[in-house]
Amino acid sequence: MRDIIFTFFNYFVFFYTSMLAIFFVTFAFLSFISLKRRKDYYVESYMRKTIKESPYTPGISVIAPAFNEEKTIIDNVNSMLALEYPLFEVVIVNDGSTDSTLEKMTEYYELVEVPYAYIERIKTRPFRRLLKSSNPKYSRLIVVDKENGGTKADASNAGINVASHPYFICTDVDCILEKYALYRCISPIISSEKQVIAVSGTMLMANGCVVKDGQIIDVRTPRTPIPLFQNLEYMRSYLIGKMGWSAINGMPNVSGGFGLFDRSVAIAAGGYDAPSFAEDMDLITRMVGYMCDFSRPYKIVQIPDTCCWTEGPPNLAMLYRQRTRWARGLFQTLNTVSYTHLTLPTTSRV
């Protein structure tokens, strides 16, 4: 009996490691093809010039929920307002902060309440008011004040309701966006024949980098082991895993830290699910389900360019909590999604 168990274990380990190796080699090859294709047609300086001069450039709403961020809110909002793109707005959702987050923004950006007909396309906690700056310098800024919903998803849904552009980016208020991130994200949309419902940008660790005025001025590798290995994991995940999935139109997820979405499809799919532990994966799954239900061709694209920098958990305790939440969110999504939407990529489904 012992020999049978030992033999079975050996075969299992051999089979598992072999399949894992084949998987990574296959996706590395697919990623290489995707990178080569992008290199052949994408020249960033030319793309920026074309997008900037075109009268048909689609607008983008950058949505960032904020809860008790009084210490960093001004620097973070200034960083978003400094983005380069011809047509965008920054929507900050004050999710019932109990500190002076809203007061600091009101004073610094000279915010005043404006009349606004709030259309609740996606249900959220009660909307209080909408504020805009009386200073033309901050004309791109919109601040939504609402009751606390307890989750980032609820605040993001309020931002989607207020957004006025056809595409939106959901990010965390403490993330650092690359100056040309919006150009990079919109390029697959304007160059694709199929409808692109979501674009995933590459994220890396900001741990160890030098930050000034809300921008990364010196890229450095993290100095401690845990953020360093997370950085390597992010590079593998985005540049091999997601680039490979993107090549066969089978992207399973667009990160909640930075992703661009088609607003009309997101609203039709019901927006973010507030109780979900992985609202980003849940949204993508339902957007794909919506497109499949109406037999509409679509694409979800991963771009290799770095668009966002985020602070990774610096210790094992915080890393454990983060990964546990991700795992719970994955099982929650798999438990609630219709299995008809989990078919092979050849049927244009995830």
Where are the model-predicted features located?
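Long helical/loop segments within the catalytic core of UDP-sugar-dependent glycosyltransferases
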Residues: 114-145, 151-157, 161, 165, ...
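N-terminal membrane-anchoring/stem segments of glycan-assembly enzymes
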Residues: 1-56
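A conserved acidic beta->alpha catalytic loop
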Residues: 94-114, 148
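Cell-envelope/extracellular polymer assembly enzymes that use nucleotide-activated donors
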Residues: 59-61, 89, 282
